[in-house]
Amino acid sequence: MELQEVLHMNGGEGDTSYAKNSSYNQLVLTKVKPVLEQCIRELLRANLPNINKCIKVADLGCASGPNTLLTVRDIVQSIDKVGQEEKNELEHPTIQIFLNDLFQNDFNSVFKLLPSFYRKLEKENGRKIGSCLISAMPGSFYGRLFPEESMHFLHSCYSVHWLSQVPSGLVTELGISANKGIIYSSKASPPPVQKAYLDQFTKDFTTFLRIHSEELLSGGRMLLTCICKGDESDGLNTIDLLERAINDLVVEGLLEEEKLDSFNLPLYTPSLEVVKCIVEEEGSFEILYLETFKVRYDAGFSIDDDYQVRSLFQVYCDEHVKAAYVTFFFRAVFEPILASHFGEAIMPDLFHRFAKNAAKALRLGNGFYNSLIISLAKKPEKSDV
């Protein structure tokens, strides 16, 4: 099965769907919002062509469920807030927003939410229906999505750490896994494996920057957030917990060792230095803001499905309940690609073991996602300088 067919979140609205298990990402969006507002402010002040008529925006790797429209809401509110503060003709410009993800993404779950979303925008922001136009643009963001110099602002949250393919060179000349017992580029991976993953990320991210710089108008902005490398004090990350669970299944004879050794996640968590270096070497963008932040991976537990704060009793419950929350979120993201390789039947047992590992990590006070946020401005063409 092609990677693009399985690289998506759990769709629908069931118990293991991304729509029901993405409150952690809502907290990440909250962290990003001040930088988003500043990015929008600088964009509107840049007075790009046609920006007073229609601001063209895209969310790359938008996923599905309510978080997709939370991102849209934050972008629209930021544009309206800046327009009101600046008291200019951009107070309520038309906004055209393209939602991008791979073809297997559950766009329908987003479309079902649009009528109520438009009504809410009209009630809370005074935006007439038709002044914010939302549509889908399916396809890989490692390829061309929009005409040249047609976009004002590109946004992506928790997507660019996904690679376009599993790196080559992960199998030795003897046909043996070079990353035996490991499912991604971890600290325990051999140097050649780490280099293979770094090379693939460098190639993909360079392509991403080049292609989307061509789609942006000169002076256009791009805001990216992705998972990045942590430090020793963070303890095991969730992929390490998954890796342990898979290895346990192999040791107990419930899963073939070959299945483990032939599985490599198409995911890379870069360091801040790597991202900075790639942007500078590609050369199309100026870095306006670059920072990292960390959030415990049970932090979103304090937010319920309607993004309301839970009771103190719920927030301060034991680590097993919080581990279940972490497991549902992780499952919503990773189950499609795991099930395509290991089979649907083993998923309940696998995630049960994952939950046990997560509870232990939380009990020890470990468990953080490290994130990187970078704000970019497209450099003017030499002829424009």
Swiss-Prot record:
Binding site for S-adenosyl-L-homocysteine: Y18, C62, N67, D101, L102, S140, F141, C157
Keyword Transmembrane assigned: no
Binding site for caffeine: Y158, H161, W162, T238, Y369
UniProt keyword annotation of Magnesium present: yes
GO biological process: methylation
InterPro entries attached to this UniProt entry: MeTrfase_7, MeTrfase_capping, SAM-dependent_MTases_sf
Pathway(s) the chain acts in: Alkaloid biosynthesis
Cofactor names: Mg(2+)
Annotated site residues (Involved in substrate discrimination) in this chain: H155, L267, E344
Enzyme Commission code(s) on record: 2.1.1.-
Top-rank EC class of the record's enzyme: transferase
GO molecular function: metal ion binding; methyltransferase activity
One Pfam family linked to the record: Methyltransf_7
Binding site for Mg(2+): N179, D261, F263, N264
Cofactor annotation comment: Binds 1 Mg(2+) ion per subunit.
Keyword line: Magnesium, Metal-binding, Methyltransferase, Transferase
Protein role: May be involved in the biosynthesis of caffeine.
Family: Belongs to the methyltransferase superfamily. Type-7 methyltransferase family.
Name of this chain's protein: Probable caffeine synthase MTL2
Highest classification ranks of the organism: Eukaryota, Viridiplantae, Streptophyta, Embryophyta, Tracheophyta
Gene name, Swiss-Prot/TrEMBL: MTL2
